[in-house]
């Protein structure tokens, strides 16, 4: 193992000082408070050292051009600002408890819960010293506008649904040790009587397919997939641990494939079709933990975003970011725009001011940095950046029009009213246009169709399982980014860019035609159809971020490893939660999947349907009529989106949020109109999420209804 010099020094100091030592307590089972204080102090040293080394290491690799695919991914998965503070506090607490448990273990005859031996004052000390202490008390909350952080949406529980809080658990977590270690951590450890397969083996045997088997979806456009990613980035983001080295060993996990917290590498199975060295691995780092509450030490993860459908991907989920995104040079309520480049006279997103920018790696001669938007992942692909650019422009268009109607409004009023309208737009497009095509129109009408009003007892938080389940959209990605000219033709020499050459390529927007060709490609190109024998294209399964190193990542394997990292129960537990049958053998699983060969592959790998990882099990189910998901995903999505609506005090249909005239005006908005109003595109898809081959299904912008803002005059 490679012990890093800087961390080695810290560890040596800790050993010499003999931390976490103290006088044996007088009463059996008790812990001296001085021992607890020593463990907290040691934990802070270890965590801070790991954080600092990792940050310097990633920046050095980016600066030198030796960054790996995981470095690129990690850069955008790193917690920042207030999220980083919350994550650091959780790591302090988890590491301190681990150190204390290690010290007390020789005095115990078997496994024990270390928090059970701490007194209430000691638990409070641990919570306060680590920074985990939270106050969720009633406070005065505005009835007019949302907060940026989502705080105060629920007046009785102001933190419910706010950013930087723990994800909801709809089922108890399942960890190998009952507390934190993911299943698969110990190779010999069985789950429900069977050894778990390596996630890369599952990817190879079930997800992998030859390119000639790829089928385009005759019913859905690529814009359908893209909206799914855009709305997902409105709802959830579970950052990874900021450490890339083991907390207690100082080992660089990417260089050694060491399995030490927070490192959980993806091992390579025999006869892997791409990675020939079985001792190699795909680096993987655990999601940052949330702070344990009370005596519950079972690991959970945080959501860095607000849980509401509120356009936070445009405005941010932290106050500091929201202020950076605003144009502070005037009082017009506008969002900031790029000061160096334009897109045919229209605004582009501002550049982020990263000291060592990963987007520069994708084209060193272009020297175009990453964009700055409300979500840190905005530059992941040009398609996603195009959506962020579109909605930044729409905010500024709304603010400008509102100022024309209300010249006495100040900048904050213009900003807040435009943001409020934007939130309603995202809600309407998602629930009226997108979800019926996900769930099937009849089912969506039955389960999500009628809004009965706000209920303060509804928990709107994003569920841990949703963060994995909503990755169903990965199965709809085509292997190329398509860009079309004004006649919807692929006429340019670079009109079809492989996905593996598009990640973090902000330069392609600046120097290769802006966002219009990308949006046309999303409207006029069909999505990939998810089939049981063709799930995920190799651009994502074998070449993810390959442009900077030989070993690209495997998105399917990452998804399954993440579900184990998060302690998510297996396939049958979630079917039971949804009131669905739980197959026990080959015959029953074959009936559920309507595919005996696939059922046999699953059982050969997992031994029992109980163990099938939620992501792969859910996307393998046959699609419901008119839907793009099977029954399990439909259940999970209905549950989550119903909670996000009914538990939102600022939902657009709630009486008092908008006037009756304003609600009527908002009901006419569409994503097609937003494109018409903010680009040079004059012919758009009328039903934008459905597959339309130009010119069929396309109309002139003059035929798309406009949003009439007269209802906002003088309000």
UniProtKB/Swiss-Prot annotation:
Domain of life from the UniProt record: Eukaryota
Site (Transition state stabilizer): 377
Catalytic activity reported: 2 a phenolic donor + H2O2 = 2 a phenolic radical donor + 2 H2O
Positions annotated as active site in the UniProt record: 233
Coiled-coil spans in chain: none
Cofactor remark: Binds 1 Ca(2+) ion per heterodimer. The ester linkage to Asp-232 was observed in 30% of the chains.
EC number in record: 1.11.1.7
Gene3D superfamilies assigned to the protein according to its UniProt record, in alphabetical order: Haem peroxidase domain superfamily, animal type (1.10.640.10)
Disulfide linkage: 141-152, 253-263, 257-281, 359-370, 578-635, 676-701
Listed PROSITE patterns: PEROXIDASE_1, PEROXIDASE_3
Binding site for Ca(2+): 234, 306, 308, 310, 312
Disease / disorder: Eosinophil peroxidase deficiency: A rare abnormality without clinical symptoms characterized by decreased or absent peroxidase activity and decreased volume of the granule matrix in eosinophils.
Descriptive protein name: Eosinophil peroxidase
Phylogenetic placement of the source organism: Eukaryota, Metazoa, Chordata, Craniata, Vertebrata
Gene: EPX
């Amino acid at each position: 193992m490679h012990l890093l010099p800087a961390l080695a020094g810290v560890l040596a100091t800790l050993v010499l000082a003999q931390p976490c030592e103290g006088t044996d307590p007088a009463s059996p089972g008790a812990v001296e408070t001085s021992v607890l204080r020593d463990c907290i102090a040691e934990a802070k040293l270890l965590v801070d050292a790991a954080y600092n080394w990792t940050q310097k290491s990633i920046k050095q690799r980016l600066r030198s051009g030796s960054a790996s695919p995981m470095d690129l991914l990690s850069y955008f998965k790193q917690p920042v600002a207030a999220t980083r503070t919350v994550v650091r506090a959780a790591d302090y607490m988890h590491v301190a408890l681990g150190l204390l448990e290690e010290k007390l273990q020789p005095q115990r005859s078997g496994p024990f819960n270390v928090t059970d031996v701490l007194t209430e004052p000691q638990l409070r000390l641990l919570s306060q010293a680590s920074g985990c202490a939270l106050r969720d008390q009633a406070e005065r909350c505005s009835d007019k506008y949302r907060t940026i952080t989502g705080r105060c949406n629920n007046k009785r529980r102001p933190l419910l649904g706010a950013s930087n809080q723990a994800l909801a658990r709809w089922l108890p977590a399942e960890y190998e040790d009952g507390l934190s270690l993911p299943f698969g951590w110990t190779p010999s450890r069985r789950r429900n009587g069977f050894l778990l397969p390596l996630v890369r083996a599952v990817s190879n045997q079930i997800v992998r397919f030859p390119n000639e088997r790829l089928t385009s979806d005759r019913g859905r456009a690529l814009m359908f997939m893209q909206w799914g990613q855009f709305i997902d980035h409105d709802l959830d983001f579970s950052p990874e641990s900021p450490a890339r080295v083991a907390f207690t060993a100082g080992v660089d996990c990417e260089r050694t494939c060491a399995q030490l917290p927070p490192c959980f590498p993806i091992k390579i199975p025999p006869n892997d079709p791409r990675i020939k060295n079985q001792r190699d691995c795909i680096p993987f780092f655990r999601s940052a933990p949330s702070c344990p509450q009370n005596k519950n030490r079972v690991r959970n993860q945080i959501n860095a975003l607000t849980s509401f459908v509120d356009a936070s991907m445009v405005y941010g989920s932290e106050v500091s970011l929201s202020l950076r995104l605003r144009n502070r040079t005037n009082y017009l309520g506008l969002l900031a725009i790029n000061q160096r480049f334009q897109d045919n006279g229209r605004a582009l997103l501002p550049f982020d001011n990263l000291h060592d920018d990963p987007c520069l790696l994708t084209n060193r001669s272009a020297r175009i940095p990453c964009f700055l938007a409300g979500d840190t992942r905005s530059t992941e692909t040009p398609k996603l950046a195009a959506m962020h650019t579109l909605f930044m422009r729409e905010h500024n268009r709304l603010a400008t029009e509102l100022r024309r109607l209300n010249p006495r409004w100040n900048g904050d009023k213009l900003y807040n009213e435009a943001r409020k309208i934007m939130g309603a737009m995202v809600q309407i497009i998602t629930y009226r246009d997108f979800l019926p095509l996900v769930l099937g129109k009849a089912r969506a009408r039955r389960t999500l169709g009628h809004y009965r009003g706000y209920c303060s007892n509804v928990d709107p938080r994003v569920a841990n399982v949703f963060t994995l389940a909503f990755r169903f959209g990965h199965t709809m990605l085509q292997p190329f980014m398509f860009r079309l000219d004004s006649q919807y033709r692929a006429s340019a020499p670079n009109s079809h860019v492989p996905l593996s050459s598009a990640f973090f390529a902000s330069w392609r927007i600046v120097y290769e035609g802006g966002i219009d060709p990308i949006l046309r490609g999303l409207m006029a190109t069909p999505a990939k159809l998810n089939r049981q024998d063709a799930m995920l294209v190799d651009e994502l399964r074998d070449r993810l971020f390959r442009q900077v190193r030989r070993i690209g990542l495997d998105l399917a394997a990452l998804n399954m490893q993440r579900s184990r990292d998060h302690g998510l129960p297996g396939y049958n537990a979630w079917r039971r939660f949804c009131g669905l049958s739980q197959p026990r053998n080959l015959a029953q699983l074959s009936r559920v999947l309507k595919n005996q060969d696939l059922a046999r592959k699953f059982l050969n790998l997992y031994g029992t349907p109980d163990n099938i990882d939620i992501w792969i099990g859910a996307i393998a189910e046959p699609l419901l009529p008119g839907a793009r998901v099977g029954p399990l995903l439909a259940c999970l999505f209905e549950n989550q989106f119903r909670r996000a609506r009914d538990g939102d005090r600022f939902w657009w249909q709630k009486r008092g949020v908008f006037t009756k005239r304003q609600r009527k005006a908002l009901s006419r908005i569409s994503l097609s109109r937003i494109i018409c109003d903010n680009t040079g595109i004059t012919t758009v898809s009328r039903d934008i999420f459905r597959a339309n081959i130009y010119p069929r299904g396309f109309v002139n912008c003059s035929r798309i209804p406009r949003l009439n803002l007269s209802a906002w005059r003088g309000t």
